[in-house]
Amino acid sequence: MYWRKKKIFILISLLLICVCLFSGYYLKITIQKANSYSMSTKAFLYLQKALNIMEKKFIYKDTIDWDSIKKEVYKKAEGSVLTSDTYPAIQLARSLIKENHGFFASPSQMELLEKEEFRFEPPIYRLLEKNVAYLSLFTFPSTSDEADQAYNKQVQTAIRALDSSNVDKWIIDLRKNQGGNMWAMLLGLGPLLDKECIGFFIRNNGEKIPWKHKKNTVKQGNSCCLKSSLPPYQLKNTPKIAVLIGNNTASSGEAVAVAFSGQKNVRFFGQHTSGFANATYPFFLSDGACLLLPVMHFSNRLGQIFYTNMAPDEVINANEATNSLKDPTIEAAIDWLCNF
């Protein structure tokens, strides 16, 4: 027993020595690299961390020549002493990898974002000709659970009011929806969604994370994202739905469109969406700055992945959302709802 304990002690000691030697070697190499760009070690490690996050997590990471990118970015950061000195280099990296859905924000910018009070337009709804229900959802930059619940209540109040006219034909207008909290939008629209699984996030390794709507709750996988404070509501009739999309339909607005994609009796009208059909995730750096990156694609319930934008079933060459009865996209939707 004594010799066994002694062997274990010796092995642990050797392991610690190896770790110390490797750490010392790594630190020496890091200092050499930092010196080669006339950067402080702190600034170099900070920039290295940001680049490593991009290289490992960015949704299009496998299409990028990272060696070339890093060379140019480190050159941009030459002479950096403080972590903040590397911010222009990080912005350059975002530009070089053509990252245009997320952002990089300094600690002071993050403080302003957290204090900013976002206002959102409530949904517009009305009964159109031929007893067609019209519901338009705008951008919803959620700030709190209270705001999510208020938004959900507004959307469901609109749906219940329209459904009281015994409608079975619906128009969901997403042409002015540039994103925000997709879960609040999907929860509000729950009565119009016909399946529990309404879409997926797709990781770079192919892993699928389902979007679920059930019993007035929306989930990402098995994790609850939002639960309605209202009782569940069921439509009087099986809905036939026209979804309107366009160039200003973006991000979570595209997620809502994807949730209806593949549903029976649904057709899309308008123009191609913005092309931000992906999920973003915030990565916080050591000084409090935030790097928001797109990390997962959207897929509809049938497994179709939207790598860029989403195309309508019927392209309508018209100006973006006028919310007018003379709107050609609305007219095309009404024609399909009533005649096909």
Where are these regions (language model features)?
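Membrane-interface motif at the C-terminal end of an N-terminal transmembrane signal
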Residues: C18-S36
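Short acidic catalytic loops
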Residues: A158, L162-G179, P239, V243-L244
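N-terminal Sec-pathway targeting helices
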Residues: M1-S23
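Terminal peptide-recognition signature
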Residues: A50, A93, L135, I172, ...
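Gly/Ser/Thr-rich loop/hinge elements
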Residues: G180-K240, N278-P282, V295-S299, I305-F306
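C-terminal, low-ordered peptide segments at domain boundaries
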Residues: L96-V167, V218-S223, S229, N309-L325
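Extended, small/polar residue-biased N-terminal targeting/export presequences
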Residues: Y46, Y60-K130
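Active-site-proximal beta-strand/loop segments in catalytic clefts of secreted hydrolases
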Residues: S136-F140, D173-N177, R203-N205, L244-N248, ...
